[in-house]
Swiss-Prot record:
InterPro entries: Actin, Actin/actin-like_CS, ATPase_NBD. It is found in: Cytoplasm, Cytoskeleton, Actin patch. Coiled coil: none annotated. Present with 6650 molecules/cell in log phase SD medium. This is Actin-related protein 2. PANTHER family: ACTIN (PTHR11937). Component of the Arp2/3 complex composed of ARP2, ARP3, ARC40/p41-ARC, ARC35/p34-ARC, ARC18/p21-ARC, ARC19/p20-ARC and ARC16/p16-ARC. The gene is ARP2. Functions as ATP-binding component of the Arp2/3 complex which is involved in regulation of actin polymerization and together with an activating nucleation-promoting factor (NPF) mediates the formation of branched actin networks. Seems to contact the pointed end of the daughter actin filament.
Amino acid sequence: MDPHNPIVLDQGTGFVKIGRAGENFPDYTFPSIVGRPILRAEERASVATPLKDIMIGDEASEVRSYLQISYPMENGIIKNWTDMELLWDYAFFEQMKLPSTSNGKILLTEPPMNPLKNREKMCEVMFEKYDFGGVYVAIQAVLALYAQGLSSGVVVDSGDGVTHIVPVYESVVLSHLTRRLDVAGRDVTRHLIDLLSRRGYAFNRTADFETVRQIKEKLCYVSYDLDLDTKLARETTALVESYELPDGRTIKVGQERFEAPECLFQPGLVDVEQPGVGELLFNTVQSADVDIRSSLYKAIVLSGGSSMYPGLPSRLEKELKQLWFSRVLHNDPSRLDKFKVRIEDPPRRKHMVFIGGAVLASIMADKDHMWLSKQEWQESGPSAMTKFGPR
């Protein structure tokens, strides 16, 4: 593999995104799932798509009702290494069609607060199984900032498995202030399944998960004014949308459209005892050094698929202003206009981490000393990972 053209691999709980350094978009994006058929071999003939013993990504997604599905990653962290290696094989050899990964370079992403053992095992597999010549592991939130051309700011990175609030100052993650919220895209989908079930639509949490995820992506939004939207939903049909299911049935979705993503702001709705994303963001910035707070408030960057809901940026801004008003100004309106917030919601934020990784990998492509080399790994082992900087 050409060592001057590094691979960029952004592995998320929900989707794997893979491509080359310097690109504006991943070449391939596929669900981070591994499926094994539930049916016995003789029953498989009745299924239109031929079932293999192991199916990965989109091919597994298409026939998921016949499969036992495994998610190798939970909350951004690799839990099942055997299946993770199957995902990597699929990404490198089936999707990218690399003849070999030997001596190539790869930039991998990881969530903030990723256990060190996780990072260590990732490097070990890349060197010892795939024989890469150079490996670099970058923190997702920092890459999202790079994609925006910033080196300081607060990243609200909400993916499928976990939401992180990460303050970064001059490219260094302020890890003591990083907050993790265990509510993200997957929880919103599950919550939507429960809300629709209460209305009498029978959805199965596993087989219909993908269908409901698509309903969520098409119809859900974050409410700016909950009372107003609830009143509208109760008294009018203004919010009702029809959605055609894959089997041809049509369902009507009304107040569930804003009730499902509300769990990001009120985690108690999905039995998570944590403050919502607005309050967590406020607490994070307020815990930072007083000298950098205003620069952090002016550079809040949304990243990840679960930050794509219409209405999310304005609701976040509203919550920050309300919290500032009540907790800092003690309800004195005279100084409220001094509080400046800027929330950046770039249209490509679903792929922000990949884009930032592609930028960084292309800057580093010819700078061999910046990568962790196979030789360094063999000589020093895990202690060589200090190369990736503070975490």
